[in-house]
């Protein structure tokens, strides 16, 4: 005798049999809610929450919650931007090595900035940034280009048209430039964490080859602004 399917069950019985409910091969049925991974939301007092947030909290008290993705951590050292950079730096699926290189890079940044802090005069110590996470985020922000070039064909010819970049594309280009620079232009005896820490510190100070590469891209976009009318979207 064939087993009953979810399509042949009444709606009330179907809600109690999630194993027989297929929602595009999902392990959860539609009654499961998405997990809340924002740590700041849990620190807010209940009186400061908006009506929508209060309604979501009330629903979570009576509805089942999906499991959080394995990449999300509750650690204070967890950073989604550093996780994305680690994934881009990973080769052949060796994420353990990529995480180790990223941890050594942050440690090298911390050591170099502490040495600079102790060598600096007393009136300049406050201006020395020693937090490697702040340095990483600011360096990544300084490397992000504002405008890029897109190939568009008109009349059988291909033109490089300047186009504004989205936030994801800006972040991707900055990460790609940093990783490519550290892999291709480092000395064979220089380790990856040492080279990457140097590039991040230079980018934090608006210096180095990555900043020059960003300026070159902006100059090319400025030189091709005569083709900007080819962009119609």
Swiss-Prot record:
Protein name according to UniProt? Small ribosomal subunit protein uS7m
Q: Name one Pfam family in it.
A: Ribosomal_S7
**Transit peptide interval:** 1-28
**Family according to the record:** Belongs to the universal ribosomal protein uS7 family.
Question: InterPro entries attached here?
Answer: Ribosomal_uS7, Ribosomal_uS7_dom, Ribosomal_uS7_dom_sf
Species assigned in the record: Gallus gallus (Chicken)
Specify whether Transit peptide is a keyword of the entry.
Answer: yes
Where mainly located?
Answer: mitochondrion
Please name the taxonomic classification of the source: Eukaryota, Metazoa, Chordata, Craniata, Vertebrata
């Amino acid at each position: 005798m064939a087993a009953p399917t979810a399509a042949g069950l009444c709606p009330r019985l179907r809600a109690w049999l999630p194993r027989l409910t297929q929602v595009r091969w999902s392990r959860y049925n539609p009654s499961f809610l998405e997990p809340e991974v924002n740590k700041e939301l849990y620190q807010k007092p209940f009186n400061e929450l908006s009506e929508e947030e209060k309604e979501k909290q009330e629903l979570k008290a009576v509805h089942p919650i999906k499991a959080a993705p394995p990449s999300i951590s509750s650690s204070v050292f967890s950073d989604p931007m550093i996780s994305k950079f680690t994934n881009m730096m990973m080769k052949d699926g060796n994420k353990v090595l990529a995480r180790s290189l990223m941890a050594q890079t942050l440690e090298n940044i911390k050591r170099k900035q502490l040495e600079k802090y102790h060598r600096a005069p007393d009136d300049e110590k406050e201006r020395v940034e020693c937090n490697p996470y702040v340095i990483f985020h600011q360096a990544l922000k300084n490397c992000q280009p504002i405008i890029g070039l897109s190939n568009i064909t008109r009349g059988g010819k291909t033109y490089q048209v300047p186009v504004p970049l989205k936030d994801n594309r800006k972040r991707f280009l900055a990460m790609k430039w940093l990783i490519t620079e550290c892999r291709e232009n480092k000395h064979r005896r220089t380790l990856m964490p040492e080279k990457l820490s140097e590039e991040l510190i230079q980018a934090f100070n608006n210096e180095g080859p990555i900043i020059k590469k960003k300026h070159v891209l902006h100059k090319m976009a400025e030189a091709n602004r005569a083709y900007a009318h080819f962009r119609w979207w």
